[in-house]
Regions:
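Mixed-charge, Lys/Arg-enriched low-complexity segments
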Residues: 1-8, 78-102
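Negatively charged, low-complexity tracts enriched in Asp/Glu with abundant Ser/Thr
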Residues: 1-43
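Short aromatic-glycine-(Arg/Gly/Cys) micro-motifs in beta-strand/loop hairpins
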Residues: 2-3, 54-78, 95
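Amphipathic, interaction-prone secondary-structure segments
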Residues: 32-60
């Protein structure tokens, strides 16, 4: 028998997906977000949020395990906020999205 362990893939837990989808459903209903995608890798998981169907993700919630569970919110490779708490990252996203209108 082969006793080699398969590498564990990082994923979002059920309650984490629920928290993200709760906000996602609100944002999609007001037309701010259009779609999402989820990626799972050995060292991280990403919930990507798309504001347009033509372009790549506008926002990414990334979960990784370096020392502990850690969440990062980024937009176009710029880190907006990071925390050990998913709730803090989601609260950052709850702020209204403001656009300058001329």
């Amino acid at each position: 028998m082969n006793n080699l362990k398969k590498p564990k893939i990082i994923s979002f837990k059920k309650h984490e997906i629920h928290e993200i989808m709760e906000l996602y459903s609100k944002k999609i209903s007001i037309g701010e977000w259009k779609d999402y995608s989820i990626t799972f890798q050995k060292s991280y998981a990403v919930f990507a949020i798309h504001r347009s169907f033509r372009h790549g993700p506008s926002l990414e919630i990334k979960k990784n395990y370096r020392n502990d569970s850690f969440f990062t919110l980024s937009s176009q490779n710029n880190i907006l906020t990071s925390s050990k708490s998913l709730r803090k990252v989601i609260n950052y996203l709850k702020k209204p999205y403001l656009k300058l209108v001329k």
